Amino acid sequence: MTASGWSANQFSALLGAYHSGPGLTAATTSALFGVYVLGLIPGLFLGGPLADRRGRRPVVFTALAISALATALLMAGATATGLLWPGRFLTGIGAGALLSAGSAWIKELSSPPYDTVSAAGAAARRSGLFLSAGFATGGLAAALTAQWAPAPLITAYLPHLALSAAAALLAARTPETATTGGQLAATTPAAPAPAAVPAPTPGTAFRRLVAPVAPWVFVAPSIALATLPGLVDAGLTGWQTVYAGIVTAVTPGTGLLVAPLARRLAARHRIATAVAGLAAVILGLLLAAFAVAHIRPDAALLAAAVLGAGYGLCVAYGLTEVAALAPPDRLARLTARFWALCYLGFCTPYAITLLTGWFAPATVLLAAVVPAAATLALIAHRGTRRGTRRPV
């Protein structure tokens, strides 16, 4: 999971370097940022069912190999920029498969007999923490390497190759929790009978309470990572890449820090974490609009932190709901659906780039508050209706 987050975010911190080095336009780098999603969708929807049928470890191994190949293509893209496109696409495929199989694997490893002491919701928090750690460290490491190392658009990717190798070694020593046919491994206690959870419940609850929140999981950090730095760093000549690296660390880093808050909110009410997360996204968008309008890097950094908090709360909510809703033999598939909806948010920077041809960037960011507020109101309404409860 950490390798997945690292692979996704190492490119984000280098957007400024691609502007000043190979001379890629803002539209091109935004499109490269978003093409990741085109690979992520098949990675999720193929990786999830395969992990349910064939086991978690084979899918994770394959995804790590694809991710390493993608990083090699990105390194080659320093001199042949056309290779950046397949590199980003394959990055998405590898990350998608890692997310779907890895989230399910963590869920099962956080349950008896592998873990007999963790509280409910621990798996969701662990998945979010590992992913956020990869986001934070990957972007910062890439930025610092690119700032001071030779051949920055090559050497910045070397740490991910080392991390992928380490992840493969650790995965090889981790117990397999599922066997072929979508059944839990023999060492795992038998799952409750299917009749304990009515068949329509997981899908219906997912569509009503999880799907509307999911895109905001990555709308928030994608704006902070790919949009804000380039709009406020005009006065940071020579330090743009370092500033972008700091933003890429602060945004998911704040997501890590709000994990205890997410746990307390979830104990109060089923949707409390989602409501708080969406409220943070709204506040972050308002701060981002102010920072862009006044070209304030400090305010943009604060906005990135608040958007990161929104990301952390929303992802914790979504993973907790998915873990509670999904039967064991559908866990990876429902997890894949959640991540697929989340990563639609990565298209946001490209949409903002297109809209700024007609509107000021600050206006576009303010306009994004409207759908965020509408989503908050919708979830608050649906989540407080009588009869709305999470399966146990």
State what each model feature region is.
Residues Y311, Y317-V364, A368:
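A late C-terminal transmembrane helix in Major Facilitator Superfamily
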Residues G87-L131:
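Cytoplasmic helix-loop-helix junction between adjacent transmembrane helices
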Residues A244-A267, G277-G284:
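Transmembrane alpha-helices of Major Facilitator/SLC transporters
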Residues S118, A122, R126-P175:
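Helix-loop-helix hairpin linking two adjacent transmembrane segments in secondary transporters
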Residues I271-A316:
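C-terminal transmembrane helical hairpin of 12-TM major facilitator-type secondary transporters
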Residues I41-A80:
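Conserved MFS/SLC helix-loop-helix module at the cytosolic interface between two early adjacent transmembrane helices
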Residues A31-G48, L99, S103, A249-L261:
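Central cavity-lining transmembrane alpha-helices of secondary-active solute carriers
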Residues I154-A171, T363-G383:
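Symmetry-related core transmembrane helices of the 12-TM Major Facilitator Superfamily/SLC fold
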